[in-house]
Amino acid sequence: MVSLEDAVIARLESHGERFEVLVDPDLAAEFRREDSDVSVEDVLAVQEVFRDARKGDKASEEAMRKVFETADPLEVTPVILRRGTIQLTAEQRRQMIEDKRLKIINKIAREAINPQNGLPHPPKRIEKAMEEARVHVDPFKTVDEQVNIVLKAIRTKIPIKFEKVRVAIKIPGERAGSAYGVISNFGKITNEEWQNDGSWIAVVEIPGGLQDSFYQKLSELTGGNVETRLIK
């Protein structure tokens, strides 16, 4: 649940009445998506419907029943979020855009590669390409909704594409147990087997941009006792 300090106002005016709720701006934007599984309880900072949230004036039950046919905040809030507007101060909007921009950059850095050499782009290079391409970030759209649009825009500045790579790994048996969960978090284990010498080998499919961090983590987990090979 978002704190009152970080909450923003979602507002709906209908039938001559005004209704406001205090919400988490990111979760409110996510909630408005048709396929969202975000709960209304998580979106709300406080389970109250206001006539004027800044003054703390609550909406009357009579007004809510007239417009929504219910006075339950958990039933009223979804209607306000989907039909109303989310109010942001200039600073809140700036911060939301900056946060969303960084999330987009990090996702692209994790999942994209330079097709010319198969290596990931550093986040700073992606950030610079976005600036040069004059990319607009929408604070109310999710990262997934915007990332392909951004990728298309920055392709005019740098060679880049989303691609998964397959990596073959071999780890001593005594290290396999602790490494398995970490490896699974990086990507999908498509093949695995135990060798006669007790070692564990596997083929893992990971986002291309994660190669460096994947190899580094494997080295840390095994004390450097790991073999890897990029499968073309």
Curated annotation (Swiss-Prot):
GO terms for biological process: cytosolic ribosome assembly. It comes from the Archaea. Transmembrane segments: none annotated. PROSITE patterns: UPF0023. Pfam families: SBDS_C, SBDS_domain_II, SBDS_N. Belongs to the SDO1/SBDS family. PANTHER family: RIBOSOME MATURATION PROTEIN SBDS, RIBOSOME MATURATION PROTEIN SDO1 HOMOLOG. This is Ribosome maturation protein SDO1 homolog. It comes from Methanothermobacter thermautotrophicus (strain ATCC 29096 / DSM 1053 / JCM 10044 / NBRC 100330 / Delta H) (Methanobacterium thermoautotrophicum).
